[in-house]
Amino acid sequence: MEYLVVAFRSRSDTVRFFNFLSANGLHAEIVNTPKQAGVGCGLSVKVSKNSLSFTRRALSVFGDSSFIGVFLVSEVSGKKIIRTI
């Protein structure tokens, strides 16, 4: 299973970005940031791996924020593998 998490330094920016994506028709969830990522406020926005281009466009429109990065999360044999993309 693979998915993306979008990490921010601020919980309020995480919630604002989640609301922004939802208002623009993209299914998203607020999740705990995987500890393996070692970044952020503890919460991230989870989106489908197939939503990368939409997510990047949304980030460019979202404006000034505490955005840290987009991470690909792969779950293999119960372990999470995190890569910055």
What kind of region is each of these model predictions?
Residues 2-5, 9-11, 17-18, 22, ...:
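Amphipathic, hydrophobic secondary-structure cores in small proteins
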Residues 53-85:
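C-terminal structural segments of small proteins and small subunits
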Residues 1-2, 85:
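Absolute protein N-terminus
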